[in-house]
Amino acid sequence: IDHDGNGNAGVPGMNGKQREKKIVRLLMLCALILFGAVWWASYGVQRAETSYVMEQRQAAELLTRCFSAVRGYKEELHIPMSQEDYHQTGMIGPYYTGITTTLGAIEAKRTTAWPDMGALCVRLLYEAGVRPGDRVAAGFSGSFPAMNLAVMAACQSMKVEVIPISSVGASTYGATDPELTFPEMLHRLVQDGVLTTDSAAVTLGGDNDTGDGMLPEQKMEILERLEQAGLVIFQEPKFLNNLEQRQEIYERQGPIQCFVSVGGNVTSMGVGERGIALGQGVLDPRSAMPVTDQSGLVERYLGRGIPVVHLLNIKQLTAEYGLPYDPVQWPD
């Protein structure tokens, strides 16, 4: 480095104008780099996150068709629409019937009966790492029929293979109509070509997953209808044996990439409060607790490194994703 006539440090062979031009070019390059970083942080990431928007729209539209079809089934069977079903979705059942298993919040049931839940399920599956062509296992109780169908619509829109095991028992305001249980809803939707995948197996749900506590006469009538429909029914009261049978059904065709749990069936949640403590939404396998004899499928799959989409605690789930909870009117 030498010095110019004014005592300033300079670069050999470079006059003042040349230095100014070089500085300007460097500043322009820095500005371009900064602009690119800002663009990627805002538009680029946003675009990457919403690259599945087409599947979200398809899932919402498909879920709307499901709701419409179920309303038609209820009309055929002379099942009145619930007064609590403010939006007339057909997804809200009576408070208590012979197949009601536990208490449930009507606000949560109404919140899930919104077509955009199909779009939310697409997002959750993508966040869990699921992609087209993957295989997903799903455990459905009758407590959240709308959310069950949202998962089915999301998987169908994403071209994901879904293996559902559905249960009859439902908490209050769920699929509690004894004449139209959730497994029957799904079966009819497949028969009518609205959905493409039926239950891989059906259980009665409730206590011991065998319908203990249900009205015996209604339980027998439902079993007869399910058998006549050709659905595979299994009744295994022993907890660990039940879990083994479910995993065998889920993984019969090969490994799964994700497990989806909807509602509070003991086979998914586990014995006691263990499943609730895990939270809701996408569960990372790194959050897994040690598996015990009381662990349900949620914990067991997490323990094997398989992500789980846990659809429970709807109020907290909607808050986390900026969605309304039990609004009087749904946003456009």
Where would I find each of the regions flagged by the language model?
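C-terminal functional extensions of proteins
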Residues: 265, 272-332
